[in-house]
């Protein structure tokens, strides 16, 4: 199995995020835009590029549970088990914010959207970066998400600081989103 965290283009993308850059990378179904979630300017640049209001919030993806542990340290055993039952995989959970996720990540919501990805390139990017990464579909608002590198370039051309290697997964729809407290499906897959 390939360790994508060692891929030169994945490493370059991780380095660009460390420097405040906005990048594109493949996910389970579509290409995503990403950046360092703790860099407010980088998130603002990503949202401006996408023409997405900050109030909508963004998803954080991680390579493993340890990378998002600080965001879930307040959960009880049953809630943690619910997460573990679906991760790694294409389910994003809305987890009550324990105060660690900044407003430019949560938007107007009291929760943070988290997913441990099972996409090998996206997980490799998180490992190369050393933590969770912002994940939102790679498209301007109102356009369909990019499903390949050609669509990424058509939408954003030279506006991105890096474009990762890899291909989007075979899923036809973006990840399902569920509310951890209610179990309700907020966005079906």
Curated annotation (Swiss-Prot):
Q: GO CC: one term?
A: cytoplasm
UniProt keyword list: ATP-binding, Cytoplasm, Nucleotide-binding, Nucleotidyltransferase, Transferase, tRNA processing
| Reactions that this protein is recorded to catalyse | L-threonine + hydrogencarbonate + ATP = L-threonylcarbamoyladenylate + diphosphate + H2O
Primary enzyme class: transferase
Keyword flag Nucleus: no
Q: Which residues form the signal peptide?
A: none
* Cross-referenced Pfam families: Sua5_yciO_yrdC (PF01300)
Q: Could you tell me the superkingdom of the organism this chain comes from?
A: Bacteria
Molecular function as annotated in GO: ATP binding; double-stranded RNA binding; L-threonylcarbamoyladenylate synthase; tRNA binding
Using the record's annotation, list all stretches that form the YrdC-like domain: 7-189
Documented EC number(s):
2.7.7.87
List the subcellular locations: Cytoplasm
The family line of this record is: Belongs to the SUA5 family. TsaC subfamily.
Q: Which HAMAP family match?
A: TsaC
The name under which this protein is listed is Threonylcarbamoyl-AMP synthase
Q: Which organism is it from?
A: Cellvibrio japonicus (strain Ueda107)
């Amino acid at each position: 199995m390939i360790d994508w965290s060692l891929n030169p283009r994945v490493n370059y993308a991780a380095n660009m995020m460390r420097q405040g850059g906005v990048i594109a990378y493949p996910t389970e179904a579509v290409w995503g835009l990403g950046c360092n979630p703790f860099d407010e300017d980088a998130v603002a640049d990503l949202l401006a590029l996408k023409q997405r209001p900050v109030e909508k919030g963004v998803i954080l993806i991680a390579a493993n549970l340890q990378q998002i542990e600080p965001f879930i340290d307040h959960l009880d055993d049953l809630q943690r088990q619910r997460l573990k039952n679906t991760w790694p995989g294409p389910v994003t959970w809305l987890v009550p914010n324990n105060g660690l996720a900044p407003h430019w990540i949560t938007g107007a919501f009291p929760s943070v959207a988290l997913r441990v990805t099972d996409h090998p390139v996206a997980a490799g990017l998180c490992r190369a970066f050393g933590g969770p990464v912002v994940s939102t579909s790679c498209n301007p608002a109102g356009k369909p998400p990019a499903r390949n590198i050609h669509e990424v370039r058509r939408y954003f051309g030279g506006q991105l600081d890096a474009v990762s290697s890899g291909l989007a997964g075979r899923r036809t729809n973006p990840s399902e989103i569920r509310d951890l407290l209610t179990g309700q499906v907020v966005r079906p897959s």
